[in-house]
Amino acid sequence: MARVLEYLKNTQFGIPYGVNCLNVDAMGFELAIQYDCAFLQLDSVVGHVKPRDEPTLDAFFRLYRSRCQAFVMGGVRFKYQPVLSEHTVEEDLQIATTRCDGVCVTQDKTGQETSLEKIITFRRTLGDFPLFVCAGVTPENIASQLQYADGAVVGSYFKQGHKDSGDLCPEYVQQLMDAVQLARNSH
């Protein structure tokens, strides 16, 4: 991963790039700092640790946010993350706004469509705070999702068989981007 980030930094394509180290948040922050990433995605910023550990997690985010200039995208009730919070989802979303620059929403697993109901709940709670759909985005659902979300992170849809282990398929990228353009033009 470091080799790719070093290449992107040194080549200076003029396009934003970022990093996601899944559940290794410190490594994500360190790579984002070292390679001048424009953004950093974290699987969870609240609710995934025991309540007694929330103050430590908050201190972790305050420390790294003071050192890192990247736009931090943080998951709340994110796929594969335990929900150990004693708070409502609405309360955790409010906490998230102090730990990241944009909230990521997913359903339960990679490639599974994120329900419009969950996206709407997050949007209503977050108001104008940036919201990104980060699982299950397809050409068929992107228009309805972008009515509520500010953007999307797409992985498995772009790959052969729409599986996260597949190779990148340019045709799938084009299909989704055509649907995004159509959705943008209709608003």
Give the location of each predicted region:
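A structural motif corresponding to the C-terminal end of an alpha-helix
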Residues: 8-16, 64-70, 99, 178-187
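Catalytic cores of alpha/beta
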Residues: 24-37, 87-94, 124-125, 131-155
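Short secondary-structure boundary segments
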Residues: 44, 76, 107-108, 135-137, ...
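Conserved anion-binding
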Residues: 24-104
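C-terminal appended segment following the main domain
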Residues: 152-187
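Active-site-adjacent beta->alpha loops and helix N-cap segments on the catalytic face
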Residues: 1-10, 23-30, 46-68, 107-126, ...
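Structured helix-beta-strand junction loops
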Residues: 99, 106, 128-129, 148
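Short beta-strand/loop segments at the ligand-binding rim of alpha/beta enzyme cores
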Residues: 10-21, 67-81, 121-135
